Amino acid sequence: MTVKYNQNGELTMDGISLKTIAQSFGTPTIVYDELQIREQMRRYHRAFKDSGLKYNISYASKAFTCIQMVKLVAEEDLQLDVVSEGELYTALEAGFEPSRIHFHGNNKTKHEIRYALENNIGYFVIDSLEEIELIDRYANDTVQVVLRVNPGVEAHTHEFIQTGQEDSKFGLSIQYGLAKKAIDKVQQSKHLKLKGVHCHIGSQIEGTEAFIETAKIVLRWLKEQGIQVELLNLGGGFGIKYVEGDESFPIESGIKDITDAIKSEIKVLGIDAPEIGIEPGRSIVGEAGVTLYEVGTIKEIPEINKYVSIDGGMSDHIRTALYDAKYQALLVNRNEEADDSVTIAGKLCESGDIIIKDAKLPSSVKRGDYLAILSTGAYHYSMASNYNQMQKPSVFFLKDGKAREVIKRQSLRQLIINDTK
């Protein structure tokens, strides 16, 4: 866990009192343990170096991105996965090397394709037959592409974040021949060069079995097609711990199991080992982030429920409403026994604006207290909205006892900056 209580009973991160952060900078605020982010990246590097295989690790921008996050990614020698013009723009503004950027997405617009080509990104991840034609049409020079294929593997996770099954808006089906058609179209194109294949079977996956099965299916399929590729990218989806009972993906042993299986399979198939790519996002930043809120109204309905309302909600914490995701809350300003079961509710005008049902908190919780919601580093700020004209929160990186603001709190003026009068 990235937080702990100090001798004064205050919750801390990297030795910094989160009560002090909340009082100094306001709430809602998202704080990250910068050293934990870096260590997660380094753990992946070490695990792959031990495998002896050529590899690349790309950070999935969609989990959380901003200029300072991109700079951190560059410092730790990761590549970058983007899925929109905005994510690409952010990366370029941060000074990230374009050749180390990969552009994903099931519906890249003509403008996005041109923008990526103009900036000489590393490669496109092809998601449809039509996209092959579009990129070839707008390219003037050789363009590296990777085909996103669907191996037909269903990861055991929430149906909204499964992506490797046949019925998916993402990728090209192996079973139904779309992947083979894509290879043929790339080979017949004027400007495109096939660099490799990519697959992403889902998110919040705790074990290795689905990744191993996927790798074997794709390697065998490539062998059947008589194709040797430079890169086999297994995507991301490595799970993290949100609540007690969850298990984080075991990076060291997990990568070893996956790479051992790949080495064994390529030996059986008699093919050269491709470079192995992965795209972690959640597992890099998820557990390193915590959201701070101030407690407001407390409403107790006798024998039914007790609602503890906070000054944020689904505008900065949508995953509970979207996926029925589970979280843990801690009282920031006092270390007391969590002897009460409550519902932590957001302040937005939606009955579904619930952060945690059956949250365990001290019965003494009152207006003006601060709460920390753990493991909110991924898909929180990046999925934040201005619903109810709520302002997006500020974001800080904490390191060596100091708080560094990496995203300023959205101002009221910024809420209407694009409105016409």
Curated annotation (Swiss-Prot):
Pathway terms, separated by semicolons: Amino-acid biosynthesis; L-lysine biosynthesis via DAP pathway; L-lysine from DL-2,6-diaminopimelate: step 1/1
Cofactors: pyridoxal 5'-phosphate
Residues with PTM N6-(pyridoxal phosphate)lysine: K62
Pfam families listed in its UniProt record: Orn_Arg_deC_N, Orn_DAP_Arg_deC
Superkingdom of origin: Bacteria
CDD domains reported for this sequence: PLPDE_III_DapDC
Enzyme Commission number: 4.1.1.20
GO BP: any one term: lysine biosynthetic process via diaminopimelate
Keywords: Amino-acid biosynthesis, Antibiotic resistance, Decarboxylase, Lyase, Lysine biosynthesis, Pyridoxal phosphate
InterPro entries cross-referenced by the UniProt entry: Ala_racemase/Decarboxylase_C (IPR009006), DAP_deCOOHase_LysA (IPR002986), De-COase2_C (IPR022643), De-COase2_CS (IPR022657), De-COase2_N (IPR022644), Orn/DAP/Arg_de-COase (IPR000183), PLP-binding_barrel (IPR029066)
Gene Ontology molecular functions: diaminopimelate decarboxylase activity; pyridoxal phosphate binding
Residue ranges of coiled coil: none
SUPFAM superfamilies xref list: Alanine racemase C-terminal domain-like, PLP-binding barrel
Catalytic activity of the protein: meso-2,6-diaminopimelate + H(+) = L-lysine + CO2
Phenotype of null mutants: Disruption of this gene does not affect growth in rich organic media but reduces the level of methicillin resistance by nearly 100-fold.
Residues annotated for pyridoxal 5'-phosphate binding in this entry: G237, E279, P280, G281, R282, Y379
Gene3D superfamilies, sorted: Alanine racemase, Lyase, Ornithine Decarboxylase, Chain A, domain 1
Residues reported to bind substrate: R282, R319, Y323, E350, Y379
Residues of the active site: C349
Self-association and partners: Homodimer.
HAMAP family: LysA
Family under the similarity heading: Belongs to the Orn/Lys/Arg decarboxylase class-II family. LysA subfamily.
Its job: Specifically catalyzes the decarboxylation of meso-diaminopimelate (meso-DAP) to L-lysine. Plays a role in beta-lactam antibiotic resistance.
Protein name (database record): Diaminopimelate decarboxylase
UniProt organism field: Staphylococcus aureus (strain COL)
The encoding gene: lysA
